[in-house]
């Protein structure tokens, strides 16, 4: 069984076991196995997930096979202390995958095993991709503020905190011992980059699949006052500090400045988000209208008198 390695023994061991377990349980059914995300791009840090997509040949032979494929993915989580984000799909059902995942597999993945089918894969339509990018950006924003909905304009999560509440307890995976959690900035960096991706979707026709690609493309195509902020958030927050709080006082001051700027960036995004949702609400597409209505439930926009408006 020929499995491509990425040069990180602990991760390569996990990836090999994933492929072997899928081949053992579904002999002859696996078309390919792809690695996406930070490990595929080569800039993974301590807190990075392992992102894998297992592609079955043709269609799933039954609903049972599809369920077993997903169940196996969950069962493999204990192979690593890191968060294992594993999706299984079939060639016939690829168009039903989330748009961001389809774009990631086609454009920025690494083939670990099997036949390379990426040239035959289609990208999601721009409208679908934009809805997905918007939904993910809002999800991370809500996680960052630890709420189910927000009111525009936002306030800092903790105005009196050293980092305005943007530093939060983080663990390696959902199964990690909560006693091992320590404060970090993973959600902060993730949220900033996801917002950048959504703004790109609003303003351009470019698909991006990774944080680095999002930041670089934002600089290339939008290049506004937030381009340097996003670059610093990615390069310092992820690549330099590995989502951890820096210990050096000078670097902590640098992080505090980034955190201070995060709030106006979030509000900048929410203004663009509202304009996008209103456009969707006025379209003839029923799915777009429903998406907009749901989004307007999660973000409450008030007028100067404090009354709710769309």
Language-model segment annotations:
Residues 203-242:
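Short, charged amphipathic alpha-helical segments flanked by flexible coils
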Residues 180-200:
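P-loop NTPase catalytic cores that bind/hydrolyze ATP
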Residues 1-34:
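Helical scaffold of the NTase/Pol beta-like nucleotidyltransferase catalytic core
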């Amino acid at each position: 069984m020929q499995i491509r390695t990425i040069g990180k023994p602990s991760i390569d061991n996990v990836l090999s076991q994933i492929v072997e377990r899928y081949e053992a349980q579904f002999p002859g059914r696996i078309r390919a196995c792809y690695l996406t995300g930070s490990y595929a791009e080569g800039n993974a840090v301590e807190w990075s997930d392992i992102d894998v997509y297992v592609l079955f040949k043709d269609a799933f032979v039954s609903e049972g096979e599809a369920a077993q494929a997903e169940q196996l993915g969950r069962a493999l989580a204990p192979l690593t202390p890191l968060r294992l984000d594993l999706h299984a799909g079939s060639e016939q059902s690829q168009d039903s995958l989330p748009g961001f995942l389809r774009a990631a597999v086609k454009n920025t993945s690494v083939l670990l095993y099997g036949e390379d089918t990426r040239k035959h894969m289609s990208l999601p339509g721009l409208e679908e991709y934009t809805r997905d990018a918007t939904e993910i950006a809002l999800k991370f924003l809500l996680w960052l503020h630890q709420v189910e909905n927000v009111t525009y304009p936002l306030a800092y999560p903790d105005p009196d905190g050293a980092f305005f509440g943007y530093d939060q307890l983080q663990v390696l995976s959902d199964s990690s011992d909560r006693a091992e959690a320590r404060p970090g900035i993973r959600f902060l960096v993730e949220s900033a980059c996801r917002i950048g991706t959504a703004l790109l979707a609003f303003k351009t026709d470019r698909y991006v699949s990774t944080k680095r690609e999002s930041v670089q493309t934002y600089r290339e195509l939008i290049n506004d006052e937030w381009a340097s902020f996003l670059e610093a958030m990615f390069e310092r927050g992820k690549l330099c500090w590995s989502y951890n709080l820096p210990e050096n006082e000078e670097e902590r001051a640098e992080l505090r400045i980034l955190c201070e700027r995060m709030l106006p960036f979030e509000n900048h995004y929410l203004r663009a988000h509202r304009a996008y949702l209103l456009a969707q609400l006025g379209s003839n597409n029923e799915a777009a209208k429903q998406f907009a209505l749901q989004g307007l439930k999660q973000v409450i926009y008030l007028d100067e008198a404090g009354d709710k408006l769309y």
